[in-house]
Amino acid sequence: MDEDGLPIVGSGIDLTKVPAIQQRRVVAYLNQFIVHTVRFLNRFSTVCEEKLASISLRIQQIETTLSILEAKLSSIPGLEDVRVEGVGQLPATEVNGPVTVVVPSQPETPIAVAVPLPPPEASPNIPDPRAAEAAGDGRMTVAKDPRYARYLKMVQVGVPVMAIKNKMVQEGLDPNLLDTPDAPVPDAVKKNTLDQDDDSDDGSESSFSD
């Protein structure tokens, strides 16, 4: 004991004479602790499930949006060889710290994408009433003429009609005859053909006479 009458070591209480805690209170305290802990864990798991469900829904929405975007991009021809320059990984200032993104102040340059245009459709062939007359008379039609037949084949393949007509004008042919392949060849054309045949015959005869 010290000067004030307090024990120097320990509480000075004889623990052998202290009555024990009631067993019912111990059980009640233990039950209350277990119930409180279980409620906390249940609430924590419920909140986690809600967060995970929300994140999963957002991920599904993003995947759906990306699928739609990929489908739209794949439907545009000519984008397979497009490359965007200047896009790379930006360095981070710290390994495990916040990432600092440096945005350049240069204006964005538009990317020109060359999209091939579909070939123009050939104008429908309008039947010409002269076709029946030409077939009945046995005259030469545009489709049977070898000079016009190759241009008609170009139209069927899908070559632009304007380019074909320009080529025909350069060669001295009538480009309007492409619209009427069953029409008879004009008399002037047939006359030129006959003149060329006569010239070739005269040339062959002169060669034989020589």
Curated annotation (Swiss-Prot):
Pfam families, per the entry: CCDC53
GO CC, one annotated term: WASH complex
InterPro entries associated with the record: WASHC3
Protein name: WASH complex subunit 3
Family according to the record: Belongs to the CCDC53 family.
Gene symbol of the encoding locus: washc3
UniProt-listed GO biological process terms: actin filament polymerization; exocytosis
PANTHER family (alphabetical): PROTEIN AD-016-RELATED (PTHR13015), WASH COMPLEX SUBUNIT 3 (PTHR13015:SF0)
